[in-house]
Amino acid sequence: MEKIPLIVIAGLTATGKTDVAVELAQLVNGEIVSADSMCVYKLMDIGTAKPTKEQREAVRHHVIDVVFPDEDYNVAMFQKDATNAILDIYKRGKVPLLVGGTGFYIKSVVDDIEFPEMGDSKQVRKKLFDELNNKGNMYLYELLKEIDKDAANSVHPNNVKRVIRYLEIYFLTGKKPTEFLDKVRRKGSERYNVLPLCFIMEREALWQRIDQRVEKMFDMGLADEVKMLLDMGYSKDLKSMQGLGYKQVIPYVEGKISLQEAKEELKIRTRQFAKRQRIWFKYQGEFVFLDVTGMRFEEVVKKCFELCKSVV
């Protein structure tokens, strides 16, 4: 069976993945499949740093604006949507590019991970968020510790999103999160001929780009976007609204902190996110790391294009 060429552009936030991918897609006659867990949400454009209208007109994008902010979406659903998009792109004689910074989303496609069936998590998640609001994050963390010490030891108590995700797995499957995840089997990249690029950047340069991105987001109307979502009735406790770029801005919209405090909080959280990304990608092993520090945009595109010749 002929393998499908798949160009992966992964890496740290704010390293210019989207801009390079759009240019590269035009050079290789490709289309982009977004691998970003936040870009799947409709109405959430600025805080998710979605490709611009011009970029989406220049190159067709897939797996963007899939669900509304109060609808469920997870890695298994992404894998199905992304795989279907890749097959469709290839059948039409074009080259698929998988682009984004959500590592496990990328891995689910590239490694063709098999996910066990899970039930509807909406009601379970609502109950857990009610517990969070009424009893606090330490209550949930202690609950996780009782259920699965190994899972609890792998996550910080303040990482509420991850704690809740582990508890969801337990209440939906009846299994310890670590046991459940151990049964997620890797089948390997049998269907794809993959070029797995990963953009990295020196810390000081990346911090500067993150600061610039946050300032630009606020200039583009991030606070107005968050206010609009709240005014439309989307709860601040939703998984989507707890995402980076939204959770940090809600207190400002509610009048609890200043604009400058909101900006600083988002900058700090984005840096922390970039650190976690760096660690995750580093330990995957299969990526070709491309340090884009100080490189001009044209140089990055040219380098990627040269590397693409191995699969296209």
Curated annotation (Swiss-Prot):
Cofactor(s) recorded for this entry are:
Mg(2+)
Any one GO BP annotation for this protein: tRNA modification
Which reactions are catalysed by this chain?
adenosine(37) in tRNA + dimethylallyl diphosphate = N(6)-dimethylallyladenosine(37) in tRNA + diphosphate
The GO molecular function terms of this record are: ATP binding; tRNA dimethylallyltransferase activity
Q: Which residues bind ATP?
A: 11-18
**What EC number(s) does this enzyme carry?**
2.5.1.75
Q: Which keywords does the record carry?
A: ATP-binding, Magnesium, Nucleotide-binding, Transferase, tRNA processing
User: What InterPro entries has UniProt attached to this entry?
Assistant: Dimethylallyltransferase (IPR039657), IPT (IPR018022), P-loop_NTPase (IPR027417)
Report whether Cell inner membrane shows up as a keyword of the record: no
Cite the Pfam families for this sequence: IPPT (PF01715)
SUPFAM superfamilies, alphabetically? P-loop containing nucleoside triphosphate hydrolases
Q: Which Gene3D superfamilies match?
A: 1.10.20.140, P-loop containing nucleotide triphosphate hydrolases
Q: Where is this region: Interaction with substrate tRNA?
A: 36-39
Indicate the annotated site residue(s) for Interaction with substrate tRNA. Answer: 102, 125
- Classify the source by domain of life: Bacteria
The EC class name is transferase
Provide the assembly information: Monomer.
Q: Which family does it belong to?
A: Belongs to the IPP transferase family.
Q: What does this protein do?
A: Catalyzes the transfer of a dimethylallyl group onto the adenine at position 37 in tRNAs that read codons beginning with uridine, leading to the formation of N6-(dimethylallyl)adenosine (i(6)A).
Please give the name of this protein.
tRNA dimethylallyltransferase
Source organism per entry reads Caldicellulosiruptor bescii (strain ATCC BAA-1888 / DSM 6725 / KCTC 15123 / Z-1320)
